[in-house]
Amino acid sequence: MLTLKIFVYTVVTFFVSLFIFGFLSNDPGRNPGTKDF
């Protein structure tokens, strides 16, 4: 059960990191070609 918890927390942290990285990458200041929502 402990291993399952660690696995779930690792996956959640991984997806949160991807979301934050994608949000920063979509910054209009870095990508002038994209529209600013």
Curated annotation (Swiss-Prot):
Membrane-spanning ranges: 4-24
SUPFAM superfamilies: Photosystem II reaction center protein I, PsbI
Pfam families hit by this protein: PsbI
Source lineage: Eukaryota, Viridiplantae, Chlorophyta, Nephroselmidophyceae, Nephroselmidales
Keyword check for Manganese: no
Function (record text): One of the components of the core complex of photosystem II (PSII), required for its stability and/or assembly. PSII is a light-driven water:plastoquinone oxidoreductase that uses light energy to abstract electrons from H(2)O, generating O(2) and a proton gradient subsequently used for ATP formation. It consists of a core antenna complex that captures photons, and an electron transfer chain that converts photonic excitation into a charge separation.
Complex and partners: PSII is composed of 1 copy each of membrane proteins PsbA, PsbB, PsbC, PsbD, PsbE, PsbF, PsbH, PsbI, PsbJ, PsbK, PsbL, PsbM, PsbT, PsbX, PsbY, PsbZ, Psb30/Ycf12, at least 3 peripheral proteins of the oxygen-evolving complex and a large number of cofactors. It forms dimeric complexes.
NCBIfam families given in the database record: PRK02655.1
Entry's family note: Belongs to the PsbI family.
Name the record gives this protein: Photosystem II reaction center protein I
UniProt-annotated location(s): Plastid, Chloroplast thylakoid membrane
